[in-house]
Amino acid sequence: DWIGAAIPLFNSAEIIRWNCRKTYLRTLEERGADLIPTVWLDDPSGVDAAGLFDALDTDRLVFKRQTGGGAHGQFRLRRGEALPQMTQPMMVQPYLQTIEREGELSFIFIDGQLSHALLKRAAPGDYRIQSLYGGTETAIEANNADVNAARGILETLDQLPLYARVDMLRGNDGKLLLMELELIEPYLYPQEGPGVGRMMADALMKRL
C-alpha cells in the first residue's frame, strides 16, 4: 500500500492483494462469472473424500491450493483412492476431460482490449498445461463468443486492470468456465502475441 501511495501502481495494490488467494473466484461467481463447480476447504483436515465426490457428482477430482501457482501442490483423485494429507487451504473441482480433449484457453487483455489468445495443451498422459510438465502453447484466433466470455469476466471487476490474463476451460456443455484470473504478474506470452509490448506501453502512457 505504501508504494501505491507514493507512485502510480498498475495493477493497483488493492486488486493485487485481492488476487493473491484463489478465494477471489468466489467473489467473481457471486457477480455472475461462470466457474467450474468448486468446494472450498479452508480447513482440509478430516475431510470426507466420498462426500466431495458426491457433492460434485463426479468420480474424478482435482485438488488445488488456494494460494499458489504453477500447479504446485495440485493433484487428481479418483473415487476410492486414499486422500493424501493436506496442510493448506484447498479448493476442489471435478476433473473435466476437456482439459485433455481441447486444452486451456488463455486470453490476454490490455486495458480491457484483447491482445491475443492462445491454446495451452498438456503433454500426453498429463493434465497440467504448464511447460514445466511438458505443456505447449499455440496462438489461436478465438471466436467472438469465447472472447466475449473472457471479457465478461473483466466486466465483473470494480476496476479495470491495466493487464489481465483470463484462463478458461470449456465445460462439458461447451460453455467456457473461468479457471483463473491472473492480475499480479501473469506471463503474457509475447511470442504468441508480439504486439502486446507496444499495446501495454500505449495503455500505460494513457494512464499516467
Give residue ranges: language-model regions:
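Short glycine-enriched loops at secondary-structure junctions
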Residues: 15-18, 120-122, 169-173
